[in-house]
Amino acid sequence: MKIIGMDVGSTTVKAVVVENGQATWQDYQRHNTRQAEKVHEFLERVETEAGVVAGRDRIFFTGSGAGFIAPLCGGKLIQEVVAVAASVDRLHPDVRFVSEIGGEDMKTIFFTATGSGKSKQVFMQSACSGGTGTFVEKTARKLQIPTERLAQMPYEGLSLHKVSSKCGIFAETDANTLVKTGVPVEEIIASLFEAVVYQNLATLTKGNTPMPEVLLLGGPNLFFVGLQEAWRHHLMKLWAQRKIALPEGRDPASLIIVPAEALYYACLGCVEIGKDEAEGVSVYQGRDKLRWWIDEGQHEQKAKAGGRALISGGDDLKAFSIQWDTWRAAATPAPESKATGPVLVGCDFGSTTAKAVVLSSDQELLFSCYALSKGNPIEDAQALFRQVREAGFEDIGGLALTGYGKDLLKDVLGADMGIVETVAHATAALHFFPDADVICDVGGTDVKIMILRQGTVADFRLNSQCSSGNGAFLQGVADRYSVPLEQYAERAFEAKAMPQLAMGCGVFLQSDIVNQQRKGWSAEEIMAALAAVLPINVWIYAGQLQNLRAVGRKFILQGGTHRNKAVVKAQVDFIRSKVPDADVVLHPYSGEAGAIGAALCAASFRKGGAPSKFRGFDTIEALTYTSTTKAETVCKWCPINCTRTFIDVKLPGAQGRAWSKVPLAAGWERVISGNSCPKGLVEDANEMRAVKAKLEEVKREYPNVADMVRKDAFRRSRAEAGVVAGAE
């Protein structure tokens, strides 16, 4: 008799077939949200390849996605931790601590010897992506690191940087900041491995000490060499600090085991438990019921539980497509547009994309380029200016930058202005729509809502520390389903129904997506639901705007996320459901709006008559740079001790800094990043005195309103003071 152990996880399906105590078949594959289909495929294979027979052999299931599948096959469901513990007990009787990291969950098990055997203490994290495989993979995709390279990237010997370990979304933001400051991707990945181990040891040990021997299970622990190195470093350090007695003659590193079968321990545990069950329990009943569920059952259930689709019918899609085409047609520059003199260039170095536009002296758009960030701001700048030059624009009369990378690149490129993002986006919107009431800019990792009064920004809402409602989250989900971003809308519009996703935090939204795919919702249906929930997160969760009617009638949608047709359809429907007579308009250059706003600001510089500081195309193309982040770059001007990065760029005429702790030769200029205040931009006392003088000047020129309000709140009125004085 054969026993099948199958683990249906959040990202993969794994299975083993055991006969007479030996594994005769095993495999694991990603299911891309089609859990039932992948399980059916595995069952078909074990029947043909391993000789499994329905009605004779037995099957046991575990994993987050096995709950509804197991009964359809006649299988019994076993809790994941119980299954893992059973296999560890049999295969590694000396192990006292287990860490299993999965795609979207992680668990730790402490084994303690007792008089009658072993006691087990279990801690799990399943509602947050922090410290899981997805935590690492999402950030690696953002950095455009292939899986094969990621698996071999090291931890040892590299400088580490602060990366949030509590949340995968915050970790992406931290990684993005490090990229924009020029930190090598190798150091960022090593820092991610550090964060994963820290999250496990800080959160899932609950103060207990992982005693040797230690067993590391799950795909991330098996495939990522750097993660194994991080585990060994921290565990050996912990044992030394807590004076844990280690077995004599054993290398401490050998006490941390990563077995070759680390993926299959839950499956093997199912088999171990199944051997002790009565013979009539969990007999495999074949694939017929599962096939019925795939073909009919799941659709019946989804029809009852789901909401309407993004598109209510062919006429709805046709009408919206006509409006979409009208908006997009306005974005086509006239073919005969030519530069007749110096041009204005605006660049927006965002979190996920880099954009550049060229305007004529009369503010006509002549050229634009838009590309996903390569992960390095200087390389992004070189690529953009290469395209500008190839388009024939050599005479630059003004250059302005905006976005996350503006501070780093302003001096390097010789930009005339660095424009705050809200100013750039408001300028771009008002240039095309002077009667706008609200501007909604949804970018890669932030959301900006600007409320206008008489052509000026009266209020704004900014959401930059959460994934709720931003484009990077949509891109991450599309990547997970192996759907090119350009096909997102087409696939989402194919859905005939969609689940109701929870509003709010991106981490919980991710968990909700996993829950919906367990119920059988397809990738297309989940992508449609994600587009539908985005406006709710943008306006209500991020913007805290419950009454859209109160902020105006004309809404301008811009930002790269609004290049997604499905997102715009959801936005239009949501806004008009709240403001029936709303005029919702897509900015003709939604992705390039920030760059256009910067270029328009450069026009004001041009009017002043001063020559541009632009360093020239040849200088930018030939840029050579190095980045340094180590003990000598840590800021010492206050107790926070920011970990700064020194980005040294080779530029003609630069003075260098021979006196620095990190010496800089003549012909090189230093850009400092990673600081949290202006003091972090300087290295010596003389520079600090100049910074302090400027800060004091600002204090004198602009009163501290908060301090004035505080003093006034606690000051008795003159009348009250007089009464008290008379009484005395």
Regions found by a protein language model. Give the residues of each.
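Conserved phosphate-binding/catalytic loops in two-lobed NTP-binding clefts
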Residues: 77-81, 232-268, 416-423, 574-596
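Glycine-rich phosphate-binding/hydrolytic loop that grips phosphoryl groups
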Residues: 133-138, 245, 256-299, 427, ...
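Glycine-rich phosphate-binding loops at beta-strand->alpha-helix junctions
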Residues: 64-65, 206-239, 243, 259-266, ...
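Short glycine-rich, Thr/Ser-proximal phosphate-binding strand/loop in the N-terminal lobe
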Residues: 3-45, 118-122, 126, 347-387, ...
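Adenine-nucleotide phosphate-binding core of ATP-dependent small-molecule kinases
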Residues: 173-202, 511-541
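Glycine-rich phosphate-binding loop plus the immediately following alpha-helix
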Residues: 34, 113, 118-159, 263-266, ...
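Acidic, glycine/GT-rich loop-and beta-edge segments that sit at the periphery of enzyme/chaperone cores
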Residues: 269, 273-342, 448, 601-692
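Phosphate/ATP-binding catalytic cores across multiple sugar-kinase/actin-like superfamilies
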Residues: 191-212, 322-334, 529-551
